[in-house]
């Protein structure tokens, strides 16, 4: 018989740098999960993506065990890295703060494809372009 699920926790954690301090500690502690076990497993799984912010979905079971799924980094993080900017524009319709090429958008869309609600690469590219537009990043051909 399958284990009974008692909770699901969604966090965004820097790859390879999970530690028991907030926000991870309190989120896992209230579900009774062994925090250090999660931190060690997460850091081992994300060691190759050092420094990126990785969304993680942790499923907690009745016996206090857990499993977790790591997702791809958020599109906004990948776009900021491609445009070499620190943060998005405060007024994206007026101030364009960076530029990315269509090739960069396609590369990000390919990377994000498993997590996007898109059936083909063209639809995924349009989703990434929308994110770029809302951040004040201009797309050049």
From Swiss-Prot:
According to its UniProt entry, one GO biological process term is: translation
Q: Name one Pfam family in it.
A: Ribosomal_L11_N
Sorted UniProt keywords? Methylation, Ribonucleoprotein, Ribosomal protein, RNA-binding, rRNA-binding
Question: Origin, by domain of life?
Answer: Bacteria
List, alphabetically, the InterPro entries matched: Ribosomal_uL11, Ribosomal_uL11_bac-typ, Ribosomal_uL11_C, Ribosomal_uL11_C_sf, Ribosomal_uL11_N, Ribosomal_uL11_N_sf
Q: How does the record describe the protein's post-translational processing?
A: One or more lysine residues are methylated.
The answer to whether the entry has keyword Cytoplasm is no
Query: What's this protein's family per the entry?
Result: Belongs to the universal ribosomal protein uL11 family.
Q: What is the designated name of this protein? A: Large ribosomal subunit protein uL11
């Amino acid at each position: 018989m399958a284990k009974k699920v008692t909770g699901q926790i969604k966090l965004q954690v820097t790859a390879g740098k999970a530690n028991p301090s907030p926000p991870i500690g309190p989120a896992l502690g209230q579900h009774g999960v062994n925090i250090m076990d999660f931190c060690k497993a997460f850091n081992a799984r994300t060691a190759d993506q050092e420094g990126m912010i990785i969304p993680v979905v942790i499923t907690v079971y009745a016996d206090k065990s857990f499993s977790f799924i790591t997702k791809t980094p958020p599109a906004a993080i990948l776009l900021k890295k491609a445009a070499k900017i620190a943060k998005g524009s405060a007024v994206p319709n007026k101030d364009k703060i960076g530029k990315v090429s269509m090739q960069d958008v396609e590369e990000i869309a390919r990377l994000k494809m498993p997590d996007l609600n898109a059936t083909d690469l063209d639809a995924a590219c349009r989703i990434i372009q929308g994110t770029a537009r809302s951040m004040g990043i201009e797309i050049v051909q």
